[in-house]
Design a protein with these regions (language model features):
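Conserved phosphate/anionic-ligand binding catalytic regions in large, soluble enzymes, centered on
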Residues: 50-67
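Alpha-helical support elements that line or immediately flank enzyme active sites
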Residues: 67-73
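Long, Pro/Ser/Thr-rich low-complexity/intrinsically disordered regulatory tracts in eukaryotic proteins
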Residues: 1-48, 63, 75-77, 81-260
Length: 260
């Protein structure tokens, strides 16, 4: 879960990625590596401003802590704008699936600290962790509101998404992500009880253009890539077992894996 990028946005970028809300654990890994490198490399450091990074927005601690969250409940109940505005008021910001400059697809929001100056790394991580847990509570409540006030519409949206994924012959990546968002919501609400979050994560990763081209062993034009993507999704879902359309299960809280 640990990687180092050299001469990217800054001279060094140490990165730890983990599933679930494990910010402290991820930070500890990066911190240990940073200490080891710091004994060998002459980091540019100022007693007042902290680490002097190539990118001005990283000056200070140089730390960017992020959490990728799936927030369909807040989007569907039209509460997301209020929540995102609240994040900006407490020193956090949001980006799309691929980070800075990327669009939000599939109701995935990357929430991170906005500034790195004037606080310790521990303070930044603790603050993000605390606010993210509040957002999870808002999302959980929004999902229950959907079940209580718009259950039929919500179930229809979920099953339509599942049906398209099961039988579509062509899917763009954006279309896939939006459909997976509906199915992921259905899984967390126990409306699609036979599907695992692991499977949905797998579909998110291995249907991206480079993965499809690696599997095909050649470059794929967009239309052919969309066809390969749909075929891969059908194959994965068929091996997971068909979900019986009659049994929608009972409404429940989100799983421990969601939202992330």
């Amino acid at each position: 879960p640990l990687s180092v990028m050299v001469n990217e946005e800054d001279h060094l970028r140490l990165q730890s990625l983990m599933s679930g809300l494990r910010l402290q654990e991820a930070w500890s890994l990066v911190d240990r590596l940073d200490e080891d490198l710091g004994r060998e490399l002459p980091y540019a450091f100022h007693h007042e401003f902290g680490f002097l990074t190539s990118c001005p927005t990283n000056v200070g601690t140089g730390l960017r802590a992020s959490v990728l969250m799936h927030l369909p409940g807040l989007v569907l109940t039209k509460e997301i704008t209020k929540v995102l505005h609240g994040l900006s008021q407490v020193g956090l910001t949001f980006r799309g699936l691929y980070g800075e400059g990327s669009e939000v697809v599939g109701n995935f929001f990357q929430v991170s600290n906005q500034t790195t100056l004037g606080k310790t790394e521990e303070d930044l991580v603790d603050h993000l962790d605390r606010i993210v847990r509040q957002v999870i509570q808002y999302e959980t409540h929004a999902r229950q509101v959907l079940l209580r006030d718009a259950r039929q519409v919500t179930e229809d949206k979920i099953w339509r998404a599942y049906g398209l994924l099961r039988y579509a012959r062509s899917l763009t990546f954006e279309e896939l992500m939006n459909l997976l968002s509906g199915v992921r919501l259905g899984t967390s609400l126990k409306l699609l009880p036979e599907l695992r979050v692991y499977t949905l994560n797998k579909l998110m990763i291995f249907t991206q253009p480079a993965h499809l081209e690696q599997a095909a062993g050649r470059d794929l034009p967009p239309a052919e890539s969309d066809s390969h993507r749909a075929a891969y999704v059908r194959r994965v879902l068929s091996t997971e077992g068909a979900v019986q359309s009659e049994g929608t299960g009972s409404a429940g809280n989100q799983t421990g894996e969601d939202p992330e």
